[in-house]
Swiss-Prot record:
It holds the Pfam family FA_synthesis. It is found in: Cytoplasm. Its EC number is 2.3.1.274. GO terms for cellular component: cytoplasm. It catalyses: a fatty acyl-[ACP] + phosphate = an acyl phosphate + holo-[ACP]. SUPFAM superfamilies: Isocitrate/Isopropylmalate dehydrogenase-like. The keyword Cytoplasm applies. This is Phosphate acyltransferase.
């Protein structure tokens, strides 16, 4: 394994350095080839490194940034006032080649806007999308995008997301000829928003995409598709609803419950079932797949959940390591031309629609 360097926006997220710094130390323990640039306020970060040993400190560097973008800041205002913030400095380290990826739990809209401004989208991509890989009940994985980077998406953007998701599923996850579906409120052709129906017509004309039609939200974890595409608003609500249900389910499995006194053998059976079911469904724990890749950029950016705990943020760091090692941006770029060559214009309602981003 070759050495790699990541830039962490340690000031971002609901809990800031109290979570991100311990998670950084956890990541260093797990990967001896990793170097981390901790971007933020040195006066806050330094005391949290008191437990770091000499070997860990040799692979850590604090990069000063005195301000932070608030989680509730409007993206446009945050971007205009972003100079010197921990998020922007972390992204600039990637742009300058001092780091190979950036990890942030900060403001999603600001991260997307700054990443697009500083790192630039790949040729043929209009806007990046947040993507994650979720486990499903068939013991496989499903690529899901967009998860919140773009609230409003037209049909062309949805098709671009489908292209990127399919390439990611094939090149990184290892799924041959991945099935691609659009998230919708029904499977009938007449269902859904105009943008979804138009995207469906367009995807049917792309010969290199294995498009299978619409999928409803209740089938997200069934394994019926390898890539699920939606706008950022729908994707974010769907993901967080699923996370909430899974957390509640796992919590119920672990709880002792209430009720009358039971015999010792019933209590023993209950505890055995709790442990067995908890192990069986532990792979669905949202902490284990925290970290959404901002797909479609010329560099690697990982967005952690704002409410991530130490374990979850450490997982996001590992996601960044894997994305760099698997050369995700390079592989996406290499495949885009073969997926829809320059000038390719599929038809939807009789009008030519160019899938390539207009520059």
């Amino acid at each position: 394994m070759t050495r790699l360097t990541l830039a962490l926006d340690v000031m971002g997220g609901d809990f800031g350095p109290s979570v991100t710094v311990p998670a950084a130390l956890q990541a260093l323990n797990a990967n001896s080839q990793l170097t981390l640039l901790l971007v933020g306020n040195p006066d806050i970060i330094t005391p949290l490194l008191a437990k770091a040993d000499f070997e860990q400190r040799s692979r850590l560097q604090i990069i000063p940034a005195q301000s932070v973008i608030a989680s509730d800041a409007r993206p446009s205002q945050a971007i205009r006032a972003s100079r010197g913030t921990s998020m922007r400095v972390a992204l600039e380290l990637v742009k300058e080649g001092r780091a190979e990826a950036c990890v942030s739990a900060g403001n999603t809209g600001a991260l997307m806007g700054l990443a697009k401004l500083l790192l630039k989208p790949l040729e043929g991509i209009e806007r990046p999308a947040l993507v994650t890989v979720l486990p499903h009940q068939q013991k496989g994985k499903t690529v899901v995008l967009d998860l919140g980077a773009n609230v409003d998406c037209d049909s062309t953007m949805l098709v671009q997301f489908a292209v990127m998701g399919a390439v990611l599923a094939e090149e990184v996850v290892g799924i041959k000829n991945p099935r691609v579906a659009l998230l919708n409120i029904g499977e009938e052709e007449t269902k859904g928003l105009d943008s979804i129906r138009e995207a469906s017509l367009m995807l049917k004309t792309v010969p290199t995409i294995n498009y299978i039609g619409y999928l409803e939200a209740n089938e997200l974890l069934t394994g019926k598709t390898d890539v699920l595409v939606c706008d950022g608003f729908t994707g974010n609500v769907t993901l967080k609803t699923m996370e909430g249900v899974v957390r509640m389910f796992l919590s119920l499995l672990k709880s002792q419950g209430e009720g009358k006194k039971r015999s010792w053998w019933l209590l023993l059976l209950k505890r055995w079932l709790q442990k067995s079911l908890t192990r069986r469904f532990s792979h669905l724990n949202p902490d284990q797949y925290n970290g959404a890749c901002l797909l479609g950029l010329r560099g690697t950016v990982i967005k952690s959940h704002g409410a991530a705990n130490q374990r979850a943020f450490a997982v996001a760091i590992e996601q960044a390591v894997q994305a760099v090692q698997r050369q995700v941006p390079q592989r996406i770029a290499a495949r885009l031309e073969s997926v829809y060559p320059a000038g390719f214009e599929p038809l939807d309602d009789g009008k030519g629609v160019n899938l390539r981003a207009h520059r």
